[in-house]
Design a protein with these regions (language model features):
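Short beta-strand micro-motifs enriched in acidic
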Residues: 324-328
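Conserved oxyanion/phosphate-binding beta-strand-loop segments in alpha/beta enzyme cores
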Residues: 116-172, 177
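Regulatory N- and C-terminal appendages and interdomain linkers associated
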Residues: 2-132, 402-458
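Middle-to-C-terminal accessory/interaction subdomains
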Residues: 34, 99, 271, 275-312, ...
Length: 458
């Protein structure tokens, strides 16, 4: 017991020294004037120093960037020693030893990611009548950050039987950093606000076989429940076959979710949707091609305008965005997925630049320009109706009133999550690694994006 207390106090002392050291650095780099910093370091040297300590460039900065933000984060960390913990659901994944070995082999990519049986316990607040759900789980994620170790690995979960996990049949459990924390939650809340199909994403306190892991996020899968909650009729949901070698349009292969069920229940609809995808890939360059015959252009215009505001461009590339085939309209609607704000340099870019042929090199538009064939289907000057809708939503989403509405959502739904993340000194998202400084959510990024959009459309 004495050893544990000494160890705890030592760790606290080391962290405190680290805080003081970082405060000194931040005061110099972010609190002092630019001219003062240049007297000591050239901008080139300063940029290299930022890279060395894994600070992302300013356009991508979702870590603490000034004394005020630093104080906000470390205040929550300090108060966490005295305040009660968060009220997120407590969830435990229970797996036997043999299946733990299988999951570990999946994590290290020694075997295919096949499902193994497990159970999930949902703890009740009074510790009575805890709910046990039978599930099957497997590892998931392309980037190594999904597979750092067994404790932090991302999991795909399917419920076995008729039970549901907070209303979900299929979902993922993953470290919040893999989607840049609450930015992804905000994206989906705004999507649903605009009557687009958005996923449920919420925090839990995760335990694995008795070991407390920490705050993880649950992300909804692609099922009929998703469609019902978003007021859509049952219909095909389509992604990409990521096992194929090509993921660039049109050299890609589409993959239907729950394909066997779909073939048994809606064979005619399945065939129509599949044929339409084939026509899209083969006819998109024809002079008589019309996007109105394939896409709900109002929904896609909303998606692209919202993406410009949030810089969640990763969610619009073919690998990420999912299609829902609406059986009533015969058109494809977007399902937002994996927006992952902060994945590349979009400091000056919006989709409108594709029409005007500006900022279309990889230094300005990141991996968007690696998928020009896909985006040019929409951002072609002949698509007058689509472009008018897109400009309308750009105007709406970049307005002062809309930014105020977003701020209300942040205060109501995200602030308490962010405070819990600050209390744990959650590291900033470096996309492929954990950042040097703690994560911080900054609304100013959206106000700056709104200014950029307004300057481009007026």
């Amino acid at each position: 017991m004495i050893y544990k207390k000494i160890k705890s106090l030592t760790n606290y002392f080391i962290k405190t020294l680290g805080i003081i050291f970082l405060l000194i650095i931040l005061i110099f780099f972010f609190g002092s004037s630019t001219s003062l910093r240049i007297n000591f370091l050239s901008e080139y040297a300063l940029d290299n120093l930022k890279k060395f300590v894994r600070l992302k460039p300013d356009y991508n900065s979702f870590q603490v960037n000034n004394i005020s933000e630093f104080s906000e984060v470390y205040k929550e960390w300090f108060l966490s020693f005295f305040n009660s913990k968060n009220d997120f659901p407590k969830v435990e994944i229970l797996t036997n030893f043999n299946n733990l070995i299988k999951l570990e082999n999946q994590r290290s990519r020694k075997v295919d990611d096949s499902f193994v049986k497990a159970r999930i316990k949902i703890y009740q607040q009074d510790n009575n009548d805890n709910k046990i759900i039978k599930v099957k789980v497997r590892s998931k994620g392309d980037r190594n950050i999904h597979r750092i170790n067994h404790k932090l690995m991302s999991l795909k979960v399917d419920v076995r039987g008729e039970d549901r996990f907070f209303g979900l049949e299929e979902f993922s459990i993953q470290d919040p950093i893999v989607r840049n924390y609450t930015w992804e939650i905000l994206l989906h809340k705004l999507a649903k606000k605009e009557n687009l199909i958005g996923l449920e994403i919420f925090p839990i306190n995760l335990i694995k076989n008795g070991e407390k892991i920490g705050i993880f996020f649950v992300e909804e899968g692609f099922t009929n429940e998703l469609l019902e909650k978003n007021n859509r009729k049952e219909g095909p949901i389509i992604g990409l076959d990521e096992n194929a070698s090509m993921l660039n349009f049109p050299n890609l292969y589409y993959d239907f979710y729950s394909e066997k069920k779909l073939l048994n229940k809606m064979p005619g609809t399945y065939k129509i949707a599949k044929n339409k995808l084939y026509e899209l890939k083969n006819n998109y360059k024809n002079n008589n091609f019309n996007i109105n015959d394939y896409f709900n252009i109002d929904d896609w215009a909303k998606l692209f305008a919202l993406t410009d505001l949030l810089t969640t461009y990763h969610g619009t590339v073919p690998k990420s965005v999912k299609f829902y085939y609406n059986v009533n309209t015969g058109l494809f609607e977007p399902i937002i997925f994996d927006g992952h704000k902060g994945g590349d340099n979009y400091q000056k870019f919006i989709f409108l630049d594709l029409v005007n042929s500006v900022n279309t090199n990889n230094q300005e538009c990141g991996f968007v320009c690696q998928h020009k064939e896909w985006f040019n289907i929409f951002f072609d000057k002949k698509n007058v109706n689509f472009l008018n809708k897109y400009l309308f939503y750009l105007e709406k989403f970049s307005s002062e009133n809309y930014i105020k509405e977003i701020n209300s959502i942040i205060i109501k739904d995200l602030n308490h999550i962010n405070k819990s993340l600050y209390a744990n000194l959650a590291p900033s998202d470096g996309v492929f690694y954990k950042g040097f400084l703690p994560y911080h959510f900054d609304l100013n990024h959206l106000t700056e994006r709104a200014k950029l959009i307004n300057n481009k459309i007026h």
